[in-house]
Amino acid sequence: TISTEDCAKLVGIVFAKASGADLALISMNQYFHDDHSQGNGDGVSGQIFALPVTDQEIVAILPTGWRNNIETYTLTGKRIKELHETGFDRKNNGILYPYQLVTKDGFTIDDNATYTVVICGATDAVKEEGNVQDTGIQGLSAMEDYLSQFETLSAKDIVWE
């Protein structure tokens, strides 16, 4: 089983590689089967149990769902760190969903540098501030392509080198 946190890391790696982004912020939430009002449809809220997986199983963890594209933003390292520390307030009600910060192994974020970052779970203010760009790359297609290289998948395989 690959945990929600590792699924968020997997999504971040796949989306960043597919879009050419420097890093990713992927919001997370547990899945509430009986109470969808607590859900975070903009983030990862599931787990992968074993390969091979169906498109339905992939979509269950993908913030982009069946058809949506990967979005990138341009933000300073300082702003990325702030977002990572505070989390995503999806409904502007003070309920914060944590972000998984995904970078290449050994990558250091410079506060003053500007980065291209994939964000799954961004407020309208962040979308405006970060000059959101639709990459034209469908999230499901990117994940299918990435997973096709594996016969099995475990948490130890989820690395960005």
What are these regions (language model features)?
Residues 1-161:
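Catalytic centers of hydrolytic enzymes
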